[in-house]
């Protein structure tokens, strides 16, 4: 007896079972779900997979998103604790890990999260060997290095969200002072996503006008306008938000969706993201930190050779040393 579906639909050819732009988010905590909703709202993927170890929450988050399918352009949302659900992902976003506590440095998190990654990363690569991995968990620069080592993937397919958000905060805060929109205020935060980040004051501009040329003391202790405080606000902002609401999630979620849009649409936009910088700016160790990088469908394809002043290069090297001093003590990075 024919079913209602048989009566309604005449099949012409079997549908495709392999997704074109599948994205996986590992970890359905506050950050993971902010990433998920930001990705969905931008309509970046045709399939979204969620993975976590907490099954009830995972199923609940999946159902909640599925119930909004009418309002989305992503027709398939799936979830499971088994990583087979992630198969054929173009990009895997890793947000899982121990949450940063109030007053805790990102670098203090490292060894606790390494052990989590030793389970996650081999599973991701097993099911999506051609994927690009975007690491979001903190401390992001060190965990991007850990992911690179555990995954065996080439360095252009292991990217850390890095200073994409720091630079967004920097541009927002400067734009607030100048009374313009953040997109019209250009500036870069490089180095560690954290306390030793580097504000590139020499490159800050509005409409191509160098602000440091107009105020040579900009970013220094001698600056009468105290622009250096803007960078301090960037560094302190995550700690402040955590103190006020317990965690950060919305801005990093939007930042991740911004990166994914560039990758999945092959836009070749330049972002400050974490990459392997050995051999650049006099850095001799295998560390990951943020430089201006071109992203596209192949991953991180090139690095912009930004002209930095001597003091900025010194700060970048200090950032690399800060990361290496923690990284060199990480135990057993075999998957």
UniProtKB/Swiss-Prot annotation:
Complex and partners: Homotetramer.
Organism the protein comes from: Sceloporus undulatus
Protein role: Interconverts simultaneously and stereospecifically pyruvate and lactate with concomitant interconversion of NADH and NAD(+).
Subcellular location: Cytoplasm
Record EC number: 1.1.1.27
Gene that produces this protein: LDHB
PANTHER family, sorted: L-2-HYDROXYCARBOXYLATE DEHYDROGENASE (NAD(P)(+)), L-LACTATE DEHYDROGENASE B CHAIN
GO biological process: lactate metabolic process
Active-site residues, as the UniProt record annotates them: 193 (proton acceptor)
Annotated protein name in UniProt: L-lactate dehydrogenase B chain
Keyword set, alphabetical order: Cytoplasm, NAD, Oxidoreductase
Catalytic activity: (S)-lactate + NAD(+) = pyruvate + NADH + H(+)
